[in-house]
């Protein structure tokens, strides 16, 4: 199989939406029957995003094989059926780490290690490895053309055209075409200068994606084509839209997929975008709306909860309901009380780390339990629900997690020190373990209890869900919690770790140790989120009576 490569770069400014554009194009190509995958190359020095602040970087997206990756991989999985893996995302830090390890081992036989060829060769090797067994691989280069950090990646993809053949490589460049209100026209000069910067590196773009708040007029597209040495049909206008799921149809309407298939000599049928048309129809035709409060500590940057927010929207599609998400700082709950939680149809507490804001989350879980408000807890959201239950129902007033109070009287949540991974290998951790790459990560088997709400939502006895955490329910105290009314609705594959808890006396109270948001998609949704939104609609109807 010959793999074709589409390299996606961005210019003028950051945050143009390279990831969304790449994912949308991949969705069209997949709809034409092609085997497609997407890679993200990040120029920062961190080995991976696992220890980066969510406020700076946004969420860490966890793949099936346990890689902690850029949030763009979440977009990729939401747009195409191909599952991402650790091969789909790597950083400058990872490349340098690998090269230096080989140098220390003596693999380079005493050679002087340089950016060219050693770093660029390592980048190319990873790109080729990630694209194996695929018809098309889209490779998104993080950052903006002109950044010093991106230069090794740009040099590597320039060399790729020489090594795999220009007929199997295509350079797609996203650029800003701003609208000037004073003159009433769009300006193409920033695009011209961005392309000039790429040309100075040795890369001639084949496709230009022109980002603007409005459609770029045909005469301006012709001007861009002339000055940037790109066919006019390869200058694509990508205006702002109210839903990212409209972008595949927008790109297809301008013939981008046809142009690329002809460029690569691929003979494939027309794209069937009927599934995306259904998604857009569901978005545009809700029969009602609900308000769900998401209580967290990173709400200053909503991208810190990107997959959770998208999963709630997907659940809205499945229930034909518009989901209004109210972001609530858990510290505000501590200082202002549960009054700020009123008028919510459901409550969700997502994952997180550290003690800041935890007591506000515990108050939130208590409020949801006592007021019979639908509740979904994820990771830390399950742990705070457990702590709240232990304190106020099971009579364990000093209950806590050893993450927050190491010597607490009732450590209902404690550090996992030993477990088996998905391959059966024993993993061990301690309080002294490094933070990076030392959590229980990736897709894990979960057995659902026969009489549980979770079993009825999933419709099957065993499921696979993704994890990212160090702390677990302390089984030593579990019997006391169960005798007080707690139900364990899901166990790990070896039946040793609690994965889901429920409160049978509550209309809808589910909390999971895993992260269900990572497997939700606009076309399929996710059972837990769909169940939460449905329960929110039912709660709203009861409250209005």
From Swiss-Prot:
Positions with a binding annotation for L-glutamine: 352, 380-383, 403, 470
Gene Ontology molecular-function annotations: ATP binding; CTP synthase activity; glutaminase activity; identical protein binding; metal ion binding
Entry keyword Ligase: yes
Residue sites binding UTP per the record: 14, 187-192, 223
Enzyme Commission code: 6.3.4.2
Activity regulation info: Allosterically activated by GTP, when glutamine is the substrate; GTP has no effect on the reaction when ammonia is the substrate. The allosteric effector GTP functions by stabilizing the protein conformation that binds the tetrahedral intermediate(s) formed during glutamine hydrolysis. Inhibited by the product CTP, via allosteric rather than competitive inhibition.
This protein's pathway: Pyrimidine metabolism; CTP biosynthesis via de novo pathway; CTP from UDP: step 2/2
Name assigned to this protein: CTP synthase
Organism: Sodalis glossinidius (strain morsitans)
